[in-house]
């Protein structure tokens, strides 16, 4: 429990320190995420992983990019 507390405190300091130097919150948060990670890449990776778990070969499949025009099936 103490470890979780200190991790939370350190995360707050990590975000708050640049803010005290005049940074904007949005810029600070964007700085925590690598530039090459996009929502499309994450979705494609998750869909690709799901397909490979269902028995398909991941080496031959390209990640599927979800577009705004695609319909998302609602779960039960």
Swiss-Prot record:
PTM entry text: O-glycosylated. The glycosylation seems to enhance the affinity to the neurotensin receptors.
Primary localization class, coarse: secreted
UniProt signal peptide: 1-22
Location(s) in or outside the cell: Secreted
Glycosylation sites: 60
Region (Disordered) location: 51-76
Source domain of life: Eukaryota
GO cellular component, one term: extracellular region
GO molecular function: toxin activity
Note: The mature peptide does not contain cysteine residue.
Keyword vocabulary terms for this entry: Cleavage on pair of basic residues, G-protein coupled receptor impairing toxin, Glycoprotein, Neurotoxin, Pharmaceutical, Pyrrolidone carboxylic acid, Secreted, Signal, Toxin
Propeptide part(s) removed at maturation, as residue ranges: 23-50, 67-76
Function: Acts as an agonist of neurotensin receptors. It binds to human neurotensin type 1 receptor (NTSR1), rat neurotensin types 1 and 2 receptors (NTSR1/NTSR2) and mouse neurotensin type 3 receptor (SORT1).
Family: Belongs to the conotoxin C superfamily.
Name of the molecule in the record: Contulakin-G
Expression sites by tissue: Expressed by the venom duct.
UniProt organism field: Conus geographus
Entry-annotated residues carrying Pyrrolidone carboxylic acid: 51
